[in-house]
Amino acid sequence: MEVNTKKRVVIGLSGGVDSSVSALLLKQQGYEVIGLFMANWDTVANFENNRESDKKHQGCESELDYQDAQAVAQKIGIPLYRVEFIKEYWNNVFEYFLSEYQKNRTPNPDILCNQFIKFDSFLNYAKNELKADYIAMGHYAKVKHTNNLSYLLKATDVNKDQTYFLCNLKQTQLQNALFPIGDLTKQQVRTIAKEYGLVTANKKDSTGICFIGERNFKYFLENYIPNQPGEIVNIVNNQIVGHHMGTMYYTIGQRKGLNLGGMNERMFVCEKDINKKIIYVSPLSLEDQYLISNQALVENMNFIEPYNPQIPISVRFRHRQNLVVVNSFLCIENTNNVLINYEPAKAITPGQYAVFYQNDHCIGGGVIAQTNANHKKINF
């Protein structure tokens, strides 16, 4: 009897076009493909009391996505299972998300989603329950497996590249991963989906919070963090120019939504004082003084591969933002922290991730703890 030597791949089938085409390509490449749909948010269990404007999102989006995933799996000819990681998502992603906002920082839950859910809970389930050799996701990224290391590389479609969100992966996670659409552009992915007749071919990309979806952010956050009203103060003359419902609803550099009437010049958020519940704003003419920095302390650095000081290094502070040249990269002894000097950049905000690149390799990333904006001294 012939032994089936095909490798088994469990694909995260989300009901979107990217994961749909990823599953199709794997099947065409001869893998044994199993689809796995994740439902990780429960509106009732997670005490979400949505306002009227958000009622349409209560569980509906996830169910529609599941129906699309079912249709895709049937069309391709692969089995589809459904799994819930609601507790894992709450403990490892959402609680951190809330704690960062309470600290006045701006977190990125998508990075934690990948680290703890897609490449941990999902990976373990796929390997232990479904006996997978690999897992696959519809990310725009590439992975290069060698005998010693697995390397995370930028996607061909630079506008869609998602390596930023994968910066916290460990070697044990990456070595089990496949990214089937890493060599394709978004347009090519949609073309393949249309040619094969997949129902997701024209489906818009998902937005909002990872696994939660679109929400009115202020209303959503009110479910978990009480409003903390305070004053909006002009930092130049210390005059009160408005009021707010909570410092967590504002980000450094924000211009829109301040509701400041009668000002001679447009204003932006330049500082936040969580203890005094004050948001400081400044005229746009002083933007460079308060927002430009060229040095940052990055904490909890994760190295996907070793840093090579002989190769130029650059950093990305936000997804899709241009890379910034790093002039010095100092690993602080006996810590997982690095001190970096970089070309001047605007509105680099604590809580965000700094993700580092050498050529096409994403070598890792960490959380921005401090910057020297407005001539602040970095302490470490």
Curated annotation (Swiss-Prot):
Q: Where is this region: Interaction with tRNA?
A: 160-162
Q: GO MF annotations for this entry?
A: ATP binding; tRNA binding; tRNA-uridine 2-sulfurtransferase activity
Q: Region entry Interaction with target base in tRNA: which residue ranges?
A: 108-110
Question: Which controlled-vocabulary keywords does the entry list?
Answer: ATP-binding, Cytoplasm, Disulfide bond, Nucleotide-binding, RNA-binding, Transferase, tRNA processing, tRNA-binding
Instruction: Spell out the Pfam families in the cross-references.
Output: tRNA_Me_trans (PF03054), tRNA_Me_trans_C (PF20258), tRNA_Me_trans_M (PF20259)
Cystines in this chain: 113-210
- Choose one Gene Ontology CC annotation of this protein and give it: cytoplasm
Active-site annotation: 113, 210
User: Site positions for Interaction with tRNA, renumbered to this chain?
Assistant: 139, 352
GO BP annotations, alphabetical order: tRNA wobble position uridine thiolation
For this protein, the record's CDD domains field holds: MnmA_TRMU-like (cd01998)
Q: Give the reactions, separated by semicolons, that this protein catalyses.
A: S-sulfanyl-L-cysteinyl-[protein] + uridine(34) in tRNA + AH2 + ATP = 2-thiouridine(34) in tRNA + L-cysteinyl-[protein] + A + AMP + diphosphate + H(+)
Q: Where is this protein localized, as stated in its record? A: Cytoplasm
Which residues does the record give as ATP binding sites?
12-19, 38, 138
InterPro entries from the entry?
MnmA-like, MnmA-like_C, MnmA-like_central, MnmA-like_central_sf, Rossmann-like_a/b/a_fold
EC numbers, comma separated? 2.8.1.13
Q: What does this protein do?
A: Catalyzes the 2-thiolation of uridine at the wobble position (U34) of tRNA, leading to the formation of s(2)U34.
The similarity annotation says: Belongs to the MnmA/TRMU family.
Which protein are we looking at? Answer: tRNA-specific 2-thiouridylase MnmA
Q: What is the species listed in this Swiss-Prot or TrEMBL entry?
A: Ureaplasma urealyticum serovar 10 (strain ATCC 33699 / Western)
What high-level taxonomic lineage is stated for the organism? Bacteria, Bacillati, Mycoplasmatota, Mycoplasmoidales, Mycoplasmoidaceae
